[in-house]
């Protein structure tokens, strides 16, 4: 009888312990990603410390700057060449939602900027996966049509 009580006690406590540890991981991952977004534009060296050595970034969509980058090219090319060229006055990022589940974190963000061809106020879904308390995978989803027309002087043409 005593064995059964201990067995059921363990059976009852184990799932809640596992669930609590899952929440700790999610909270920890949110802190990493919060710090990344707090620093990426103003203090990129701090943000880059939060990126895993095997990092992969992809600006999703079909556009001139929609490409894949690794840790080195994310900093040297994306942050130091691509973004300054198309957003010479910078961009303001307003976080609207934060979602974490397991090793994944998703932020939705509203951007406000003037692109080289006019107002560029795009909405983003930033999908990140973490490993060893660092960001290892990052896909940035946005309106590639808006990116093309405001950042690259492309025009929409009627086909009629």
Listing of model-derived features with the role each one plays in the protein:
Residues 52-100:
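A solvent-exposed, acidic/Ser-Thr-rich amphipathic alpha-helical stretch
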Residues 29-30, 36-43, 55-57, 63, ...:
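N-terminal/domain-start segments enriched in small and hydrophobic, helix-friendly residues
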């Amino acid at each position: 009888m005593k064995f059964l009580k201990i067995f059921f006690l363990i059976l009852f406590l184990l799932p809640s312990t596992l669930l609590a540890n899952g929440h700790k991981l999610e909270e920890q991952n949110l802190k990493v990603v919060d710090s990344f977004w707090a620093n990426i534009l103003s203090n990129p060296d701090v943000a880059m410390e939060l990126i895993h050595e095997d990092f992969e970034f992809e600006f999703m969509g079909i556009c001139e700057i929609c490409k894949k980058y690794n840790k080195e090219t994310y900093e040297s090319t994306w942050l130091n060449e691509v973004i300054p060229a198309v957003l010479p006055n910078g961009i303001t990022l307003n976080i609207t939602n934060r979602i974490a589940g397991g090793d994944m974190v998703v932020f939705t963000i509203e951007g406000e900027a003037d692109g080289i061809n006019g107002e560029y106020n795009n909405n983003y879904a930033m999908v990140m996966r973490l490993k060893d308390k660092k960001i290892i995978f990052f896909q940035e989803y946005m309106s590639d049509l808006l990116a093309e027309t405001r950042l690259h002087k492309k025009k929409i043409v009627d086909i009629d």
